Amino acid sequence: MHRLTLPAPAKLNLWLHIIGRRPDGYHELETVFQFLDHGDELTFALREDGAIRLHTEIEAVPHDSNLIVRAARRLQEQSGTGLGADIWLTKVLPMGGGIGGGSSDAATTLLALAHLWQLDWDEDRLAALGLTLGADVPVFVRGHAAFAQGVGEQLTPVDPAEPWYVVLVPQVSVSTVEIFSHPQLTRDSLPLKMRPVPEGNSRNDCQPVVEQSYPEVRNALNSLGKFTEARLTGTGSCVFGAFPSKAEADKVLALLSATQTGFVAKGSNVSMLHRKLQSLVKKSSA
């Protein structure tokens, strides 16, 4: 195989509690990640000369510091391969939205190139490499909804309900550094002691600070909150609400379309990236 096209799915933080701050400045978190059947798309083509070339219309991030390029080069260095790749990115997910666009792109890159370069790397090794690129990368490498602890890298698989979601995308990029350094951020939520993880009595501890700093996000939460419980995902700008059917979610998004931008997507406990990879493995072994 010399060419491969794979999705890079979005994720939601169904809730996010900050339970402390470490001596190195990073925050201790508890959160639940769930995937959406919606995301970017990447195409990879094998190069024999070892070069990594990213082709995209997005110019906000310099080529060499783009997380896709960094992931490819890190895997190249660690594996010792002499192969390279051309990578085409079709960008759908917003930057700074809190739905994992950059981390998901990096994870798809690691999994795709491990397949394309025929590396004998298992998921554990790829997830460990992913962690060096960002705390959210391992959950995309693993591909299963998870209860996350630590800085988000300690993952326990979970299977929450898989509703349809309306996700609103305010036209603003939220700075994670700004939010986590905000003096009014809650940093002392009590760690959960119940298993399985309770869905009730949860929240996003970053939401009050983001609402205060970004009126566009506050307006989106208020708009969606007229129809269902609306919540911020991660430390980004996107807000979401759950609905029992696609028809109901589509109706709500249509009602909000005059003032809000967004999309409807199905929640999924197994990412569409992993479903696609599993189908490729089945085809190759058939």
Swiss-Prot record:
Top-level taxon of origin: Bacteria
Active-site residues annotated for this sequence: K11, D136
S-S pairs: none
EC annotation from Swiss-Prot or TrEMBL: 2.7.1.148
Classification via SUPFAM superfamilies: GHMP Kinase, C-terminal domain, Ribosomal protein S5 domain 2-like
Annotated metabolic or biological route of this protein: Isoprenoid biosynthesis; isopentenyl diphosphate biosynthesis via DXP pathway; isopentenyl diphosphate from 1-deoxy-D-xylulose 5-phosphate: step 3/6
Catalysed reactions listed for this entry: 4-CDP-2-C-methyl-D-erythritol + ATP = 4-CDP-2-C-methyl-D-erythritol 2-phosphate + ADP + H(+)
GO biological process: isopentenyl diphosphate biosynthetic process, methylerythritol 4-phosphate pathway; terpenoid biosynthetic process
Keyword terms, alphabetized: ATP-binding, Isoprene biosynthesis, Kinase, Nucleotide-binding, Transferase
InterPro entries assigned: GHMP_kinase_C_dom, GHMP_kinase_C_sf, GHMP_kinase_N_dom, IspE, Ribosomal_Su5_D2-typ_SF, Ribsml_uS5_D2-typ_fold_subgr
UniProt keyword Lipoprotein present: no
Binding annotation for ATP: P94, M95, G96, G97, G98, I99, G100, G101, G102, S103, S104
A GO term for molecular function: ATP binding
Keyword Transmembrane helix recorded: no
Function comment: Catalyzes the phosphorylation of the position 2 hydroxy group of 4-diphosphocytidyl-2C-methyl-D-erythritol.
Entry similarity comment: Belongs to the GHMP kinase family. IspE subfamily.
UniProt protein name: 4-diphosphocytidyl-2-C-methyl-D-erythritol kinase
The encoding gene: ispE
